[in-house]
Design a protein with these regions (language model features):
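Positively charged n-region of N-terminal signal peptides that target proteins for export
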Residues: 1-5
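Bacterial N-terminal signal peptides
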Residues: 7-17
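Extracellular/periplasmic catalytic domains that process cell-envelope and extracellular macromolecules
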Residues: 31-33, 60-62, 79, 155-160
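A mature extracytoplasmic/lumenal domain signature
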Residues: 42, 53, 71, 168-170, ...
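Structural alpha/beta surface segment adjacent to cysteine/selenocysteine redox centers
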Residues: 44, 50-125
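C-terminal cap of thioredoxin/glutaredoxin-like
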Residues: 122-209
């Protein structure tokens, strides 16, 4: 038990150290090979995040931007952190599976409670011909990643969810925070117009940081 606790502390310290070392500005960059991205800090139990999610998915589809999701757990949400840890587990199985799990949780959010979260997760896993182990985070490393992501958000002064930025790989085009969700597509087009022409267009993907 003592060894397991020490291991968990070490993993958490390493994850938090990585988050602090990277600095908040590194989170506001698109993944390698992409010119633009939507960076979102979200909580899986947040109703506003659930409302915004289809719009983010549509933006990825329509504009070819990457979507970088960050965990930002709201402390008074009883099942949110565990759902984020589950999502991290599915990321390990397949990044697309993790993405689909997040969309699934958002789509069914109003029916999910702390007591039935596991049932919903098992239902998702079964529908995708996989299984969620009884102990899906035995060493605490996934929990540490979720908590480290939340630290990154705090360092960026994230106070509410979802917090969304349109970011680019150009130093001349600074990140733009979306304050009115209705203007997301308009903002993407405006930011895209500021980028210099490039030979290859970005591939449509969802990414984890």
């Amino acid at each position: 038990m003592k060894i397991k606790l020490l291991t968990l502390i070490a993993v958490l310290a390493m994850s938090l150290g990585t988050a602090w070392a990277a600095g908040p500005s590194s989170a506001l960059q698109p993944p390698a090979g992409h010119r633009m991205a939507l960076v979102v800090f979200e909580d899986l139990e947040c109703p506003a995040c659930a409302t915004a999610d289809p719009t983010l998915v549509q933006a990825v589809r329509d504009y070819g931007v990457a979507l970088v999701r960050h965990d930002f757990v709201i402390p008074n949400h009883p099942w949110s952190k565990e759902a984020h840890i589950m999502a991290r587990y599915f990321d390990k199985v397949n990044p697309q599976l993790g993405e689909e799990f997040r969309q699934y949780i958002f789509a069914n959010q109003q029916q999910i409670f702390k007591a039935n979260l596991r049932q919903w997760a098992d239902r998702f896993a079964g529908a995708h011909r996989t299984a969620l182990p009884a102990f899906y985070d035995p060493d605490g490393s996934l929990r540490a990643k979720v908590e480290a992501d939340t630290v990154v958000g705090r360092n960026l002064n994230v106070h509410l969810t979802p917090t969304i930025w349109v970011v680019t790989n150009s130093p001349q085009v600074p990140p733009v925070e979306i304050t009115e969700r209705a203007k997301l597509f308009e903002t993407i087009e405006h930011v895209k117009a500021q980028l210099p022409a490039e030979k290859a267009s970005a591939e449509k993907k969802t990414h984890r940081k």
